[in-house]
């Protein structure tokens, strides 16, 4: 019973720390940036960026860091070279899934795998990926489930507020560490294997530019 009380308190802190923008605060441009479906639209470009948002974030890209990485990547490589795709569908970014052993649920992982498989259908596309908070666990687990040929086409991954940072020792099991960059802000207790959310967990938008540069350095365009 005590565990459930602590868990509920931790999940409640997630809601408090991740306020949803009100309708009056969200411009049309910002709402559009929170959703990106280039791969689902059939856009085969030189680079595909797949991103999984954090818990309670709206859209399929979220608003804390996903859209920023996408826009910076397009600015760096050229908007005609980059397709951005958020993980939506079965991945609802709910709170309770954080408490599962994989820090997310199997349906969400399968949804991300589906996006990687979609990108792999583009024969000349190099794949990069990212995830924030619960989304980092989604991407981590999804990459482990890819077949070898698809995983080999994933050139770089960025993880923000990595919820499996402690469990997976700051990397994605079975994926090259030098192709992975983990962002864990000072004071972000999520990176220490807890569900405790602090203000630091909301700061990763500051790393969007650096993350895009890292991903750009991993591909050849």
Curated annotation (Swiss-Prot):
SMART domains: Cutinase
GO biological process, one term: carbohydrate catabolic process
UniProtKB keywords: Disulfide bond, Hydrolase, Secreted, Serine esterase, Signal
Chief localisation class: secreted
Superkingdom classification of source: Eukaryota
Induction: Constitutively expressed in a manner dependent on transcription factor FarB: levels are unaffected by varying lipidic or non-lipidic carbon source, or by oxidative stress.
PROSITE patterns named in the record: CUTINASE_1, CUTINASE_2
Secretion signal, residue range per the UniProt entry: 1-17
Active-site residues, Swiss-Prot/TrEMBL: 133, 188, 201
Role of this protein: Catalyzes the hydrolysis of complex carboxylic polyesters found in the cell wall of plants. Degrades cutin, a macromolecule that forms the structure of the plant cuticle. Also degrades suberin, a specialized macromolecule found in the cell wall of various plant tissues.
Protein name: Cutinase 3
Biological source species: Emericella nidulans (strain FGSC A4 / ATCC 38163 / CBS 112.46 / NRRL 194 / M139) (Aspergillus nidulans)
Lineage: Eukaryota, Fungi, Dikarya, Ascomycota, Pezizomycotina
